[in-house]
């Protein structure tokens, strides 16, 4: 059993971006949370499972104003969103953020048949899938394609990247060539068959993303990668080789 003080890990990247994750979960289930430091405020993309309070256990998230962007409302990405006062999401998934039912967040599908054990390398203390609930976190703002999140000295453009979920969001920072893709594209098996997924929409999103030339891509799971791997992953997906289903998400 892993205590709260050891549950989260923070790993700094270039351009004042830090990965926060839960290293006691396998990569497929381990959400990559991305903290971006700005002059006037910071930005956090996604909040993980929420097995333990996030802000209390990650010093980086204390003492500064933070805008929390929910890329999509699956349970592994928004378990601690309620801890933040400034909460952004796409309109298509705002109802789930406000009232996170287990079917909508895919938690019911994931934990059915005692499969929640697959989610952990080692369990958080006191974990009980039967009593786990994501607290409501109504959005304080809605964002859509083309909106800009301004941190004072840097800005990210919002990309609506549906397919994995109807309101999935990614972020693009042209100045650094950084794409925070989250679950639309990462270096692992992509999920195309789950509640809210649409393979036709997903294909259109991937074709649009293929036109971007990133320096680095930060996905919602697995390791970050560069432009060549980005194109490889999209091309493989579009060829029909990356369209796999998984019972979890």
Q: Which functions belong to the PLM regions below?
A:
Residues 40, 63-65, 214:
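A general structural motif
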Residues 12, 19, 70, 88-89, ...:
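Structural signal for conserved beta-strand scaffold positions within catalytic alpha/beta enzyme cores
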Residues 12, 60-61, 79, 153, ...:
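Structural motif
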Residues 7-60, 170-186:
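Conserved beta-strand hairpin/beta-sheet module of binuclear metal-dependent hydrolase folds
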Residues 42-44, 49-50, 132-134, 138-141, ...:
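Metallo-beta-lactamase
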Residues 51-148, 229, 235-247:
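Active-site HxH/HxHxD metal-binding segment of metal-dependent hydrolases
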